[in-house]
């Protein structure tokens, strides 16, 4: 969910205001304080259906269209009405559960919800249980029976099946929200959702919200399980995207080693203005790139699934505040064994089947390509996600240092830029098959299928009305930097990468756990905690940090402009620059020379 202050004007419904929905005055005040005046298109459609007709909602809308408030406003409004009618006999159970695929998204929903209940926090308490919290701490928090619980499916199942079953109460549950449904299914949470359904009062007028960026036939099972005659809303963001078309997409065919060379040239010469996210496919790959860039004095910060949740959230927050300009993000949650090309062309067949069992009340929209494939979930923290859902703001460029393994992942990655009506650039490095495996130290297994994946991506994007063009540059201009990259890359060994990985993890664990309470009491001290410090586990060659003028193009050379006329010879000065001294003669006896 994007704030309205950063949302594109194409998404706003200026014919309505939030007062049109007859919301609680406290909600209207909090919305006004946050800068929200007009609802977005998806909000103006979903809120009346949820509040007045009590319909289940299945909504398809892209990131930044206001999906989060589209379900939070009806949930909070109904809970406030429920509490006001009950009076002294207020229920003590949890009334709403919000399920999200990653812990980062859970944190974002918590922040939005806290702002929404700013003036009614005594009536509505919320709890984010997505993070791993000690049982001695979690028990008392659940015993307070918060009105709204935010969690990932796996964490909620863990609590329901554990010793906290008697502590948490879902018997009075009124709302179930499943946000980013397509991503939840991609991460393999189907079994967790079925387990959760056993603890829900599905036959007691439970209102469900299924929010997603795409609708496919996989959602049909969830629709049958949780919804009763839902209202299906589709936002016409394809027309919006075609109108603005501010995302420029390029690909560069380079060898494995030249990926590092191009990165060095691009960021050392500041060829990209603004903030950049670099996506890599493995954690080691991210640290290797960071260490190589450090050899040339280029600072960056790392975001991956090994880091603690608090550190990951702080990195995202600081990146959004423009503290860092370069973020290296590991996108290692999805590994695809084989992707069927027919699924890339499937289009909206899944959403058509979905609409058969429900009433399609409003179609603000369009056709969106969806991809499905045989998936193998990586054994990492599957509740981490950088390429999807995380609210990165004002990103100028997305650089796919390693091409993703599917066309679907490509769409998720480039979706981090050109958001809310702003322009952006996506650049992808592609390794030709003939270049694969020639440079073993920089080799990556997934690069073997780069050309095959690129063909699918181009085909998919062309169906959506976008073009991916080859990025042409003069190879001779960067050849002068090659010997410097070879020196810098040679210093970053596998041992150095492993040491950097351990050192970074130790630093972040210390900052995340031991200093957590201190930072809560002293929030200003948190500003001094940086994540882009140099790790220095490799041998750093200081001369590589400076680019000599002879490597720069003539337009970028400034030495000749600053230095004035320097004469070849100055006869007034001694050639050595100082007066010559006479050599002392033979030492004389001071007693004989005394007068």
UniProtKB/Swiss-Prot annotation:
GO molecular function: ATP binding; ATP hydrolysis activity; DNA helicase activity; DNA/RNA helicase activity; RNA binding; RNA helicase activity
Subcellular location: Nucleus, Nucleolus
Motif DEAD box: where in chain: 179-182
UniProt short sequence motif Q motif, positions renumbered to this chain: 16-44
Positions of the UniProt region annotated as Disordered: 340-376, 562-595
Origin superkingdom: Eukaryota
Acidic residues compositional bias, start-end: 340-349
Record domain Helicase ATP-binding: where: 48-233
Protein family (similarity comment): Belongs to the DEAD box helicase family. DDX56/DBP9 subfamily.
Domain notes: The Q motif is unique to and characteristic of the DEAD box family of RNA helicases and controls ATP binding and hydrolysis.
Protein name, UniProt field: ATP-dependent RNA helicase DBP9
Organism: Eremothecium gossypii (strain ATCC 10895 / CBS 109.51 / FGSC 9923 / NRRL Y-1056) (Yeast)
